[in-house]
Amino acid sequence: MASSQVGDMVNGNAEPTRHLAKFPPSLWGDRFTSFTLDKQLWDKYGNEIEVLKEQVRSMVVAGGRKAAEQINLINVLQRLGVSYHFEKEIEEQLEQLFAKFEDNEDYDLFTIALHFRIFRQHGYKMSCDVFNKFRDSNGEFKETMSNDVQGMLSLYEATYLKIRGEGFLDEAHAFTIAQLESLVEGPHLSSDLSEQVMHALKQSIHRGFPRLEAKHFISFYEKDASRNETLLRLAKLDFNQLQLSHREELCHIFRWWKELDLISKVPYARDRAVECFFWSTCAYYEPQHSVGRAVLTKIMLLLSVTDDTYDAYGTYNELKIYTNAVQRWDVSAMDELPDYMKALYRALLNVYDEVERDLAKQGRAYGVHHSKEAFKEIVRSYEIEAEWFKEGYVASFEEYMKNALVTSTGRLHTTSCFMGLEADVATTEAFEWILTKPKMVAASGAIGRLVDDVMSHDEEQERGHVATGLDCYMKQHGVSKQEAIVELYKMIENAWRDINEEMLKPTAISMKLLIRVLNLSRISDVVYKYVDGYTHPEIIKDHVISLFEDPIPM
């Protein structure tokens, strides 16, 4: 979020006042500068993976399995992180399973909730009426549920797929959290099950970073007496092989960023190359999207430095000049800029030129124009916030959110993310869809903006910052900070409901595109869960190491 300095001079002196943020430095030094891919190991993994994939594909399409067994197999494949190898087969199976599903089957809570979650994740609108049999005549949850730990855990995870108007799932969410927390504190759960429950309470499946959650689940699954060794072996090999690829990509990005040497010219900015790549890997981790990860990371880095320029260094007059330069998007505009801004502006133009050249080779350059326009729009909104800060203006919450849905980067990140997808998926129509300001992109932006406003509020206000959504809501409604936080989290939950609903069939665009918007939303849940983990990267350091450095023991 942007803010600017009160004025360009103090007491007539030429040196402007700058409310420096003093962001924490990069954690990584030269840790990711060099990496040599062990091609022999990579090929070894790959050869075994191909054999195992065919065995698992045969499992998925084999007939004769009961519906509950089939849905559980699909769930395990998803949670192990290997379902992307079998998307077509899984979708065909789910279409048949949903068409034949009968809620009068004698399914237990675990199985019903599992069906509900898997169907909803794939766009099938199963009614929450399927849970009615677990309520008594007074509408209360049956007491027997409290003793069914796996059922409670399954229902808890299912509640994250709720849409607006599903009050039952709100009640079920609160009920299962209370029961599971009580069980964890008691003596009756095994250590393995207790660990699984504690992790779920900390991070739900639906809102988690898919690759990190896969690694967690592998550690649980290998202790499961009913595990399938073929599935487990495939999951471990797949994670480790993909980790090698991601590590090599990160090394290229890290070296590119070091060679660009932008941070030495704008030392006030956050140096977050590794964290931006982590972010991009959440958007799409699959091996075929290596170009997309590089593109998205580079654009995120440029936006991060731009944000910090408006937020923690530039004077109002400097920022107005920079905003105009970005709108022109022409190298001649550089002559009007202060020296430190010239470096940033040059990097912006050069990186987009580089991205356009790379994508043109694959016939996908048409998305670059949309990304540029989204970048220009964000900068204009940053300037609006800079003006608000200069004037000491506290907007109404509605006025604030209208601007904040731009600065939340929803449109830019979605557009830039789409640029990395296959041309037959990210079509010109897909980019035009973004221009319609779809509910899902707005909801994703609202989640990121509001959770960031809550988590970074105290630190930003301490150094001097434009009024955030929290401040605007407190002033407009005359409520305390804590009361405003409660209301903002209600809005965040409603935004998640909107995302879930937009992913139900029939969808406006391909599910392959919508899943990227969902993944961008998931980042906010992971990175900003307890504090601003982007500004304070030590919060997500273990996630980065787990994803890019620590392989799974074979």
UniProtKB/Swiss-Prot annotation:
Protein name: Valerianol synthase TPS1B
Entry note: cofactor: Binds 3 Mg(2+) ions per subunit.
Domains (record comment): The Asp-Asp-Xaa-Xaa-Asp/Glu (DDXXD/E) motif is important for the catalytic activity, presumably through binding to Mg(2+).
Swiss-Prot/TrEMBL cofactor(s): Mg(2+)
GO BP, sorted A to Z: diterpenoid biosynthetic process; sesquiterpenoid biosynthetic process
Assigned protein family: Belongs to the terpene synthase family.
Biological role stated in the UniProt entry: Terpene synthase that catalyzes the biosynthesis of the terpene valerianol, which is a volatile compound of floral scent.
EC supergroup of this enzyme: lyase
Amino-acid positions noted as binding Mg(2+) 2 in the UniProt annotation, renumbered to this chain: D307, D311
Binding sites annotated in the UniProt record for Mg(2+) 1: D307, D311
Entries under CDD domains matching the protein: Terpene_cyclase_plant_C1 (cd00684)
GO MF entries: carbon-oxygen lyase activity, acting on phosphates; magnesium ion binding; terpene synthase activity
Catalyzed chemical reaction(s): (2E,6E)-farnesyl diphosphate + H2O = valerianol + diphosphate
Listed EC numbers: 4.2.3.204
Cross-referenced Pfam families: Terpene_synth, Terpene_synth_C
Motif DDXXD motif boundaries: 326-330
Domain of life: Eukaryota
Pathway it works in: Secondary metabolite biosynthesis; terpenoid biosynthesis
Ligand binding (Mg(2+) 3): D452, S456, E460
Entry keywords, A to Z: Lyase, Magnesium, Metal-binding
